[in-house]
Structures are given as structure tokens and as C-alpha cells.
Amino acid sequence: MEIVHVVAINPYRKGNKGKVFSYRMDTYDKVIGSEEIKKMIQQIRGELPIDGVDLNDAQAVKKAQERLKSELPFFCPHYGMFKNNVRRQENALPESFLFQTIIDVDDKEYVEKAIEKARELNCSSGIWNGSLLHLCYSARKKLHIGIRMPIGMTIEETQKAYCEALGVPYDESCITPERMIFLTDKDSEIYRSKMWCAVLPESEIQARRQAFLDRGLTVDGRGDAKVNSLQLIAIVMTMFKTIDFRAIVAIMLLLLALLFSLPNLVIAIMLMILISGILEAIMALVNWERPVRRI
């Protein structure tokens, strides 16, 4: 089956930052393969002079480089479509969520190590196995790492966990639904998986959406996760596991001895048996483990 790719992109230089359009990957490839973008990237990195800017004026050069960077075409990695082509959070269409995100590595000294570590994580036996989708140098020769989000994990959770595994600081500005990434030239692309910006198979989409819904989130993983009944039970069970039931039984027996005189000893014994049975039932429930659900 043919893999369909979709990308929310503004392919124009000096494009309106509030507008993005849904295209196939050939538009993306056309932009990063253009000579104009290549020249802009070289100028931003100081590899080529900028017309009308004195190379001896460091402040002027820096300002001109920032201006050029702001003029680059851009795309949004989290969603393939925005309502009315307006790039804002509430316009991100949930059904176009791509279940991917981009990690920023802003420390130039760590870029090459991060590339190696990302590849290592991709081949590991943990949750990041097969997660690597894209590696690309940013406009200032830092690093963008595109990854597949583990099933059930939100953008924020994915970013935090991956940054920890990678050994880089977590950046909360990277988790917004409408986040934009400036495009760089083809030579800056280090690696691209065939599943980068791909529409996942319907069965996987449904499984991922359900994993979010089970947590009380929207189908694209937004909102505050609610504590459902199973989670509430888990919390109660955790609390019970901290209780010393032998101490409770001893206290109950002492109270029964004080409350009941010898003629009522039979009643006391019956109550003790009943309480012991209840405590045993609670302990059995505490130690019971719910079977793992396989998707």
C-alpha cells in the first residue's frame, strides 16, 4: 500500500507566520531543494556574505542573519491540516494529528553526540525502538530530531522523556500544537524515514486515538488526563500496601477485649473472624495484578 505523506507548510519566503497550507511531500522537497533556500542558509551560518552588510560589523551581521532566518519558509510538524489554513492552536484539526514531534538540540557542542545517541535509541529495546523519523541541521547548524511518539504519550510527555534519554534540556516551547519549524536546505538533512510526515495505517491511528481517550484526553492527546476508575483503584491499592495489617488486627483484638465482657466472648470471636476475613479479602485485592492489555 502506498504511503501518503502530508505536511502543513508555508512554502514562501517572508510567508505570513499565521498561514499554513496542506501539501504532499513533493512541495516540501521542492522548497528545501531550491538554490534560494540553500543560499539563505549559507548566509545565516556565515558561510556567504549578505548583500549590503559590512562583514566587519558583527552586530549588523547578526541582525541581518536573524532577519534572513525569519524569512525562511516553515512547516508545522504536529498536524497535517489547520482549519481555514490558519496556524493557531484551536485551528489544528485533531483528525490530522501525525503522532510525531521534533526535539530541539540547541547546544552546538552536543549536536554530533546527539545524532549518535538518537540512532542508538532508535536501535534500543526500549520505547524509542524504531522511533527515529528525521534528523536535520537547523538554520544555525543546531539539530532537529523528528520522532514517533510512543502510543498513549502526549507531545509534552514524549518531549520530556526523550530529552531525558538523549541528555539534553527539555524546552516547553517545543510542545505547542501549532509549533513551526524553519526549513533548511537539502544538504542539511541527515536522515529521513519513509514514515516522516506519513499518515499512519487506519488501525494504528484508531489504536493511538483510543489510548488517548482511555486517559480522558482528546483523540490528538490534548486536555488534562482524568483519573479514571482503574487509576483510582490503583491509587487506593497503593495506599493499602503501605498499611501493616498485622498491627490493625492486634489493635482490633485489643478493642474487642475491652468492649466485650466474658459472657459476650462468642460475639467478640465472631466479629474478629469477620474482620479478619475482610482484611484478607482486601489483601488479595491489593496483590492482584490486572492482565496487560496488548494492542
Model regions and ranges:
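Short beta-strand
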Residues: 133-140, 171-176
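Long, distal/terminal scaffolding or interaction modules
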Residues: 228-295
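DNA replication initiation modules
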Residues: 6-14, 82-109, 149-232
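A generic structural motif
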Residues: 141-148
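Short amphipathic alpha-helix segments
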Residues: 105-129
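DNA replication initiation on ssDNA origins
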Residues: 1-99, 222-225
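Short amphipathic alpha-helical segments that mediate assembly, nucleic-acid/protein binding
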Residues: 34-37, 41, 55-61, 111, ...
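Structural alpha-beta junctions
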Residues: 1-3, 120-134, 164-170
